Amino acid sequence: MLPTQSDRLLSYGDPQGEADLRQVLADYIRQRRNVNCSADDIVIGAGVQSILNLLCPLIHDRKTVSFPNASFVQGSTIFSDYGFEVQYRNKDCDVIYVSPAHMTKWGEIMPVSRRMELVHYAAAKGSLIIEDDFENEFVYFQRPTPSLFNLAGGHGVVYIGSFSRLLLPSIRLSFMVLPPSLSRKYAAVAERYSQTASKAEQIALCQFIRDGHLTSQTKKLKKLYAQKLKALENEVRNTFGSNCTIQTGAAGTSLALTIPYARTGLELKKEARMHGMSLLILEENAATITILLSCSSITTDDFAPACQLLSRLLNK
């Protein structure tokens, strides 16, 4: 007799992740991202950090890792803890960590030509690419570009996906697809590790995807965020006029606002916090400041009041 879903909750989970969820994910990313793999190549964990904690011992023979910038501290810290030398924007490193659909905080996407160049260069050097496909679901203004995993034919690339944007940040479920050489390495040591992701959440997500709800959710959120991002851009232009520069990409939920400002970003952040506003400052110099504005966790009705408050703080 096959176990019921309730019965499954009475046992420990598969260290690699629930088999049915791994199969559903293999089918899903094959259809959505043309990532061709088997369920045996997929490893599930509670967030990207957990995934990287499993990956680093498999690639301990490599010594250097490159990140696009210093903003992904959660990722670079894991590699540093395992003895990797962390560098930035250096394609000659042994490991290259990249998010092609999130090259900048405001959603610039790596073009296909650059992806092909990176895949070929890494293959020639023997480097491993880690493709974090963060926010690939939210590409609005151009056709989705192929994954690096697909362009590399499934070799020399580790593909990482997660669901924090599509579902809830509190649902800590991420996965990685290992190329054949690393998949064999992981299989030899899998039983040494415990599964970090909730078994109940894995079972629920599996059914959610099977029933078509994830595809439906993605379509709804993609439409919603595209509309909200455009509305935010319009509100920023209305508030700051020609005095500002706005940078937007083809994906994501944020834009970058550059505006004249003579004081320090630290002062601005402190004053903003006093008014209940949290600011992410991307860059500042003696004459201007660049701030990241996100539409994801604020209602459209609050765009105008938020922009007006920011304008007052900048002009104090």
Predicted regions and their residues:
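Conserved glycine-rich beta-strand-loop-beta hairpin in the small C-terminal domain of fold type I
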Residues: 223-233, 244-258
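N-terminal "arm"/small-domain region of PLP-dependent enzymes with the aminotransferase-like
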Residues: 1-14, 274-277, 282, 293
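Conserved core of the PLP fold type I
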Residues: 3-126, 130, 136-138, 143-155, ...
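Conserved PLP-binding active-site segment of the aspartate aminotransferase-like
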Residues: 178, 256-261, 278-308, 312-313
